[in-house]
Swiss-Prot record:
Primary subcellular site in the record, as a coarse category: mitochondrion
Gene symbol of the encoding locus: RSM18
Subunit structure: Component of the mitochondrial small ribosomal subunit (mt-SSU). Mature yeast 74S mitochondrial ribosomes consist of a small (37S) and a large (54S) subunit. The 37S small subunit contains a 15S ribosomal RNA (15S mt-rRNA) and 34 different proteins. The 54S large subunit contains a 21S rRNA (21S mt-rRNA) and 46 different proteins.
Gene Ontology cellular-component terms listed: mitochondrial inner membrane; mitochondrial small ribosomal subunit; mitochondrion
Entry's Gene Ontology BP terms: mitochondrial translation; translation
PANTHER family: 30S RIBOSOMAL PROTEIN S18, SMALL RIBOSOMAL SUBUNIT PROTEIN BS18M
Organism: Saccharomyces cerevisiae (strain ATCC 204508 / S288c)
Compartments where found: Mitochondrion
Origin: domain of life: Eukaryota
Protein name: Small ribosomal subunit protein bS18m
Organelle transit peptide: 1-16
């Protein structure tokens, strides 16, 4: 008699599960001759709602997980930058070491979502970076 395999899945499906944080465990019961698979879901993918909470199906979608991760990353950014401390970014046009933190490896100015600056300071920062590039320091 051949062993019964429950939940047999293809390798591409396993990769997709792994990419979404679902890891697969196999346990073999020697006495019964059966292979059982249990799936462990990553906690970042599960949503714990308090009792009596009204929820939307969007709360369980991948889009919601991406939004949560995006805003959590912004909250957790512990960058103690001079820019966030109230200094005027235009004053740093001659300091490429400071301004290079706000430029990508290809030389593009990072977006406000990434820098975490206000709209006003982001404009000032962009102007300072362009000035620094124009005078040849960056």
């Amino acid at each position: 008699m051949q062993p019964i395999i429950k939940g047999a899945v293809s390798s591409t499906f396993k990769r997709a599960l792994y990419n979404f944080g679902i890891k697969e465990k196999k346990s073999v019961n020697i006495e019964m001759g059966r292979t059982q698979q249990t799936k462990k879901i990553d906690q970042s993918l599960s949503k714990k709602l308090p009792k009596g909470t009204i929820y939307d199906p969007f709360d369980f979608s991948m889009g919601r997980i991406h939004l949560d991760r995006k805003y959590q990353a912004n909250k957790n950014s512990n960058r103690n930058d001079i820019m966030k401390s109230g200094a005027n970014p235009l004053e740093f046009y001659a300091r490429p070491r400071i301004l290079s933190r706000y430029v990508t490896s290809t030389g593009r100015i990072q977006h406000r979502d990434i820098t975490g600056l206000s709209a006003k300071n982001q404009r000032r920062l962009s102007k300072a970076i362009r000035r620094c590039q124009a005078i040849g320091l960056m």
